[in-house]
A protein has these predicted regions:
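Glycine-rich phosphate- or other oxyanion-binding loops that anchor nucleotides, phosphorylated ligands
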Residues: 27-194
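Short, intrinsically disordered C-terminal tails of secreted or membrane-associated proteins
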Residues: 200-203
Length: 205
């Protein structure tokens, strides 16, 4: 059973597997995910993710939230995507980590995402942007918890906030999460991607 979330607003939600101590099963089948607001900034997301891992001891971490889509992208407003790569925008190349999911999210189009400090940064090959993804992945990697990210597109990058379709994006996200919790629960340990840090960032082995 998925706990009801009190509004999506602009705050991503980290959905967590049940505490490890209660089950040694590799997936989430038969377990109740926990959900927490992860905040609307890199610092808030990092703190919330770390706190959730300490409190819940999850098998998996799934970050869910809204995103803006860059004009050249084929991703539509209202669509939900699985983030295939999360980049830290604005850092010098030598410091620019790239993060990739460490378990599979089935059934969604994938997209490359920029983690930005402000909206409107150059896409540099990314299709969507958000603020929290890289911080979330960095904490998950440091603590050794498999992690993935999904985003519902609420706006085109550069649009004023007044025209963002936040409610529509949150509804689409809630529908997908209800399906994903069951599907992710059937993922076997053989389907998990190894968690490691490399010169290109954190991601697939």
């Amino acid at each position: 059973k998925l706990r009801r979330l009190s509004g999506c607003a602009a705050k991503p939600v980290a959905a967590l597997g049940e505490r490890r101590q209660r089950s040694s099963a590799p997936g989430l089948a038969g377990q109740r995910p926990a959900a927490r607001h992860a905040g609307s900034s890199p610092a808030a997301a990092a703190a919330a993710t770390a706190r959730a891992v300490v409190d819940e001891r999850p098998d998996l971490l799934l970050l869910a939230g809204i995103a803006g889509v860059y004009p050249a992208s084929e991703v539509a407003v209202g669509e939900v995507v699985a983030v295939a790569e999360e980049r830290v925008e604005g850092l010098p190349e030598r410091y620019a980590d790239v993060y990739r999911p460490t378990f599979a999210v089935p059934g969604l189009r994938t997209a490359v995402s920029n983690s930005v400090a402000r909206s409107g940064a150059a896409p540099a090959g990314a299709e969507v942007e958000n603020m929290e993804g890289a911080a979330f992945f960095a904490v998950a990697a440091a603590l050794g918890v498999p992690a993935a990210e999904v985003r519902a597109v609420s706006n085109r990058v550069g649009e004023p906030f007044g025209v963002w379709r936040v409610a529509d994006a949150c509804e689409a996200l809630a529908r997908e999460l209800a399906l994903l919790v069951g599907e992710i629960g059937s993922v076997s340990s053989q389907d998990r991607l190894p968690l490691r840090r490399s010169a290109g960032g954190v991601g697939k082995g």
